[in-house]
Amino acid sequence: MEVAGAQAGILPLLLRHPASLRGSLSLSCGGARRSWAAAAATAEGGGGEEGRGYERVPMDTPGAYRLVDRATGRSVIVWGGTDDVSMPSPAVLSTTTRVPDRPKENGRSTSIGNFGRLKAQKVKVLARRSAHLKREDSGRISTSRFSESPSDESDEDGTYFERDRARNTRQNSRSRDDKTRGAHSLNSVLRQYRGADDLDFPGSEATSGSKRWGNISDVTFGRQNQRQKGPLDSGFFSRRSFKEIGCSDEILGALRSFGFPRPSHIQAMAYRPVLEGKSCIIGDQSGSGKTLAYLCPVVQNLRKEEVEGLHRSSPRNPRVVVLTPTAELASQVLNNCRSISKSGVPFRSMVATGGFRQKTQLESLDQELDVLIATPGRFLYLLQEGFVQLNNLRCVVLDEVDILYGEESFEQVLHQLITVAPLTTQYLFVTATLPLDIYNKVVETFPDCELIMGPGVHRTSSRLEEILVDCSGDDNEEKNPETAFSNKKSALVKIIEESPVRKTIIFCNKIETCRKVENALRRVDRKASQIKVLPFHAALDQQQRIANIKEFLNKQTADSMFLVCTDRASRGIDFANVNHVVLFDYPRDPSEYVRRVGRTARGASGNGKAFVFAVGKQVSLARRVMERNIKGHPLHDVPCV
């Protein structure tokens, strides 16, 4: 803004226009106090511009002009109001503000303090106005996509969605009851929270004008805007390069062909200890890259031994054994091995699980072998029958170790393995969740294990939106498993109809419930023209399960696919680009909750939503779990590193 009176050495004075601020200040300028009342009287008594004692000089700033005293040349800038408002009145111009006498510094007047206060007031007014305009702009944007759900609708339609009141972390000191609002009906939420973040499918209701869901973080436990800053906010990738963590040129070339710019946090943390042959417990959240965190350094050691002539591949004598809880996870690890091998790091790998022809697997064992991937039962059979020797064994990997320890026969398998394996064998325990009882069992048997815990262990992804759906029903409704299933089914159908996405995983606790959900979904689309229902549980033979998994992971399909499964699908399987996860039945323990919702929002940039159906006491339990997730707290205590 132009400085008035600069040539005369006069301090510029900024005043609110009298049209908007009555009682403006008249301050001394440059140490000489002079009232503008005489000038104003001259202006009112004079006829026309020529007879005035001062004149108004327009400025470029709208609503501002410079008031110049013709007699002395002194001027003041007046800002505010409109350009065509009349001159300040004599009463305004002659008003003075009494200030306490202050000691002078070097003989100069301290009237600058008045100007300072006026300037501070002006800045505060501008700040308030700016904040108000921002709130109005954000309100216009938000109300165009979100509308506040009326409280009376939730009473009419029944309670379905829990609204999170703890979005602002300043409210953390409030009680738990104060952190959540009243529930909203599924109907009202589906009716009001619409947007374009879900996919459109040819021939689906979404393309024919049906309502769709948008970003509904106002009524969800999504952490994109709510989670407190923590280690997870530093991003998926580590700041270190693959070269810095110890990758060989061969492995580095393979990783570059995969398109990875840098290692993930757990890969950067675990690579060097694994490469040095240390036994380790490796833990981080689902989708963090744990498979490559152990596989790449292990394969690098195999290649180093071959180059140095220390060891070579031999039939029925693997140098690495990987045990997994399910055949599907074993197949996934095998695919990773083959991808590395095809990218310029040659080694031989095979899988041995139940459900396949035993003759084919035995024939594969007769060939040269480096890495054997197996389920515990099949591995124990091959070991006891003499089809596998462990003379050359260098490393044992127990993937999803917490699940393995939950199997009755696993400790027998582990004992047999320890008895036969060489004393120098390296053991790697890999998991997304490590309850303290499992940790204690591991360190009791392997006290020298190095503990490597990534930033996301026992935590869900920060890009996951968790939505609590209360399926308890009305208070006067009879409470039994049948009514609970009916309420859940109604909620699921509404989600399918109102929020069409490409891939959804539905978790149930029992095979019987899976079948009931499958039938309900098929009745929604009797012609099977818009949705594809794929079951995945132990009642199916292994070939059918693998076929369904492959179809679900197919990127070319235009169908909206639903994988209806038990916890078998949550055990380490890497599902890419899953949009929604539905917990139709609430999981039995927090670890299973983490594994289930971890099937979406995976990797460096994955996003997804988890719909958690709960009834009765499960509602408060789910709310507490989600509140911990919002704050970034682990669902289990993390073992001390």
Curated annotation (Swiss-Prot):
<dbReference type="GO" id="GO:0071369">
    <property type="term" value="P:cellular response to ethylene stimulus"/>
</dbReference>
<feature type="region of interest" description="Disordered">
    <location>
        <begin position="197"/>
        <end position="216"/>
    </location>
</feature>
<protein>
    <recommendedName>
        <fullName>DEAD-box ATP-dependent RNA helicase 50</fullName>
        <ecNumber>3.6.4.13</ecNumber>
    </recommendedName>
</protein>
<dbReference type="GO" id="GO:0016887">
    <property type="term" value="F:ATP hydrolysis activity"/>
</dbReference>
<dbReference type="GO" id="GO:0003729">
    <property type="term" value="F:mRNA binding"/>
</dbReference>
<dbReference type="InterPro" id="IPR011545">
    <property type="entry name" value="DEAD/DEAH_box_helicase_dom"/>
</dbReference>
<keyword id="KW-0547">Nucleotide-binding</keyword>
<dbReference type="InterPro" id="IPR001650">
    <property type="entry name" value="Helicase_C-like"/>
</dbReference>
<dbReference type="GO" id="GO:0071395">
    <property type="term" value="P:cellular response to jasmonic acid stimulus"/>
</dbReference>
<dbReference type="InterPro" id="IPR014001">
    <property type="entry name" value="Helicase_ATP-bd"/>
</dbReference>
<comment type="similarity">
    <text>Belongs to the DEAD box helicase family.</text>
</comment>
<dbReference type="Pfam" id="PF00270">
    <property type="entry name" value="DEAD"/>
</dbReference>
<feature type="domain" description="Helicase C-terminal">
    <location>
        <begin position="487"/>
        <end position="641"/>
    </location>
</feature>
<comment type="function">
    <text>Probably involved in resistance to biotic and abiotic stresses. Confers tolerance to oxidative stress and mediates pathogenesis-related (PR) genes expression. Exhibits RNA-dependent ATPase and ATP-dependent RNA helicase activities in vitro.</text>
</comment>
<dbReference type="Pfam" id="PF00271">
    <property type="entry name" value="Helicase_C"/>
</dbReference>
<keyword id="KW-0694">RNA-binding</keyword>
<feature type="region of interest" description="Disordered">
    <location>
        <begin position="129"/>
        <end position="189"/>
    </location>
</feature>
<keyword id="KW-0067">ATP-binding</keyword>
<dbReference type="GO" id="GO:0003724">
    <property type="term" value="F:RNA helicase activity"/>
</dbReference>
<feature type="short sequence motif" description="Q motif">
    <location>
        <begin position="240"/>
        <end position="268"/>
    </location>
</feature>
<feature type="binding site">
    <location>
        <begin position="284"/>
        <end position="291"/>
    </location>
    <ligand>
        <name>ATP</name>
    </ligand>
</feature>
<keyword id="KW-0347">Helicase</keyword>
<keyword id="KW-0611">Plant defense</keyword>
<dbReference type="GO" id="GO:0006968">
    <property type="term" value="P:cellular defense response"/>
</dbReference>
<feature type="domain" description="Helicase ATP-binding">
    <location>
        <begin position="271"/>
        <end position="452"/>
    </location>
</feature>
<keyword id="KW-0378">Hydrolase</keyword>
<dbReference type="GO" id="GO:0050832">
    <property type="term" value="P:defense response to fungus"/>
</dbReference>
<dbReference type="GO" id="GO:0071446">
    <property type="term" value="P:cellular response to salicylic acid stimulus"/>
</dbReference>
<feature type="short sequence motif" description="DEAD box">
    <location>
        <begin position="399"/>
        <end position="402"/>
    </location>
</feature>
<feature type="compositionally biased region" description="Acidic residues">
    <location>
        <begin position="150"/>
        <end position="159"/>
    </location>
</feature>
<feature type="region of interest" description="Disordered">
    <location>
        <begin position="86"/>
        <end position="115"/>
    </location>
</feature>
<dbReference type="InterPro" id="IPR027417">
    <property type="entry name" value="P-loop_NTPase"/>
</dbReference>
<dbReference type="InterPro" id="IPR014014">
    <property type="entry name" value="RNA_helicase_DEAD_Q_motif"/>
</dbReference>
<dbReference type="GO" id="GO:0005524">
    <property type="term" value="F:ATP binding"/>
</dbReference>
